[in-house]
Amino acid sequence: MTNVSYDPTRELYKEYNEAFQKHYKEQTGKDIRIVQSHGGSGSQARSVIEGSRADVVTLALSYDVERLQRAGLIDAGWEQELPDDSAPYTSTIVFLVRKGNPKGIRDWNDLTKDGVSVITPDPKSSGGACWNFLAGWSWCLDHFGGNEI
């Protein structure tokens, strides 16, 4: 069995696959070999569309899953599988600061302070970067009601 997924899930699936292998053996009496393939979400989607073997595919962005649907690899309506058209994952955004946190960064609003720079991956090439931007946008909607500041 080949599990194709995006980069940050490597450790999660290593543990999950080991638990699944044990469960499968208990249920069927047979061993199952699971091969992991990890890369950027868009690259993984493209690879599967172009014919790479995949029994299980998990991607970071709904856009990449939609590409699989358009290629005829999954049925329409996949987004309704979970309540509120949600994803089966959560992401935690972490602010890394200099030792001692000299600029007092504690929340999204602190990122607007003079002299604060933000470094994040390019959302065109990183699913995690898209989630970073969406988390910031969500924070703004919650705190400013969609009004510009």
Predicted features along the sequence, with ranges:
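Ligand-binding pocket segment of bilobal, Venus flytrap-like solute-binding proteins
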Residues: 144-149
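Active-site cradle of extracellular carbohydrate-active enzymes
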Residues: 128-129, 133
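Helix-loop "lid/cap" segments that line or gate small-molecule binding pockets
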Residues: 135-142
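N-terminal segment of the mature folded domain
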Residues: 1-126
